[in-house]
From Swiss-Prot:
Matching InterPro entries: Pro-rich_19 (IPR029355)
Lineage top rank: taxon: Eukaryota
Lineage: Eukaryota, Metazoa, Chordata, Craniata, Vertebrata
Organism: Bos taurus
Gene name linked to the record: PRR19
Protein name per the record: Proline-rich protein 19
Assembly notes: Interacts with CNTD1.
Amino acid sequence: MDPGEPAPKPFQQPEKPGRVRRRKTRRERNEALAGSRQPLTYQHPPVASRDPHMVLRNSVAPTAAKLVVITQGRLSRDHRGLFNHEVKSLDVARLLSSESLELGTPALTTKSSPSPGRGQQPSLQSRGKENQVPGGSGPGPPSPPQLPDLEQLLGELQCQLILPRAFPRRNLVQEARDAIVGTLQACHGCVPDLTLVLRGCQPHLPGTDPGALKRQRMTPSWINSPEQAPGEGRQRRRQGTKELTFAVPPTSSTPTVHQVSLAPPKGPWPPPLSSLPSPSGAAWGPPTAFDLLKSIWLVATPPPPRPWGIGPPQLLPQPPSPLLPRSSALDWSPSPPAPLPSLSWMVAQSSPEAWSFPPMRLY
């Protein structure tokens, strides 16, 4: 060999470009999958080869209009689903019998009628009753396959539920009341008076007179005159005078002013809220922020004294308020007896910091 010649290379196949296989589409994959599962899904013989008696017998039952194939993600025909491309349930029987909704109630009644009869046979045999064949000889005529009796259905249902007192007559309302009363007696040892709860009153305290509370609960105090309840009126007047003497500066003449201010305003409007019968503080609950604001606002605003020519009218018995003192500023009538002082005077007297309250009128 010539040394200038290149050495012969061993035999090699020429390199071919890599073959890119085309991926099948979803339709092709579904068709291939449907072709493999077709004999498993559809096994009914054609209609022409069936027995005519069987065709008449099965004409009531719903039959599939055409082949239904459940593939990876869709059906081959329209169905009642959430989406057209999804199958939310794998219940093939429900999908195949979707025409039963269109047939109406006869298909449902004929389909559900033989089920109680089949369920009755084991229960009758277990109870040891008559185990005759429906068409056999018996003392009475052969019973046709009809719906069972209502009492029989109730008895079987009672046996299946294993509830001995499921169907006898029961007074459920009385049982509920007995259960509530038993729970109250077990927890608290007594049953509360429901009349007090319905009227929104608390039971009387041991230190108070039950007769006075009863009279106060039956009739509002603004209807009663001082002659009907003289002791209560005097006691409440004394307590109101004490509170007012504590709250108002000593410069003003307290007894005369507040005898005048306690009078109800004359007019067609109802009596003020302060004169209405108010239960104890426990009945109203703890004081709220609005009560605190009223106490801050109204304590430092004494009304100007009235002229001496006005005589004191008749006084009305009023229950003492647990939070607020008795003053004419608490009179929530449409026309207050005296105008309130200015906001600047109130801020200067009651608070070290400037409160920006809007001009407000209690009603």
